[in-house]
């Protein structure tokens, strides 16, 4: 069965972990901050009643989320790694490079970024940059189904297909962008409507 790594467990990472565990998917979590596990417990306690109303999958449980001490352990057997670290390009590049070296070769590496381009994010991914995408959610992640899936110039079609399948199977509505643009689609629509 699928397992997913959530790297960076702030508000967005905790939202993703809540969403995936509510769909019965095993989640491997990592964050450098030791308090992140408490934040997740608080997030999922608040989220679970709303998620129950929307409908949980068979086998859904907050206990599906396991925290790891090392990022390498969190990502090693996953089909998707969802990176949701703070919006600092150098930090994301460093994390994605580490993930790229540690995860399986057919694993999709997705960043939750709301602003950076795949081509910049994947700059230091030397193993398989063709499997890096942006998977940009809307907050709260466990309630709003839309995810923008964005390819970079090196991203392979098979990576996009796999990412779309994983997100769709977890109950997400995927807006697929084959070319990267500044600001993605939904954010631009929001700006245009103002």
What is each PLM-predicted segment?
Residues 32-35, 39, 49-108, 116-117:
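Rossmann-like NAD(P)-binding element
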């Amino acid at each position: 069965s699928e397992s997913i790594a959530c790297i960076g467990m702030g508000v967005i990472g905790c939202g993703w972990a809540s969403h995936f565990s509510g769909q019965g998917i095993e989640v491997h979590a990592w964050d450098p901050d030791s308090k992140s596990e408490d934040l997740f417990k608080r997030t999922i306690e608040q989220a679970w009643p709303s998620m129950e109303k929307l409908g949980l999958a068979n086998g859904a449980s907050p206990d599906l989320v396991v925290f790891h001490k090392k990022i390498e352990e969190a990502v090693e057997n996953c089909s998707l790694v969802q990176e949701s670290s703070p919006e600092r390009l150098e930090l994301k590049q460093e994390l994605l490079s580490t993930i790229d070296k540690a995860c399986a070769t057919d694993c999709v590496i997705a960043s939750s970024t709301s602003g950076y381009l795949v081509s910049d994010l994947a700059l230091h991914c030397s193993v398989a940059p063709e499997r890096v995408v942006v998977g940009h959610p809307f907050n709260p992640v466990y309630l709003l189904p839309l995810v923008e899936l964005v390819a970079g110039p090196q991203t392979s079609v098979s990576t996009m297909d796999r990412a779309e399948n994983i997100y769709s199977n977890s109950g997400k509505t995927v807006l697929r962008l084959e070319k990267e643009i500044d600001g993605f689609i939904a954010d631009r629509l929001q700006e245009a409507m103002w």
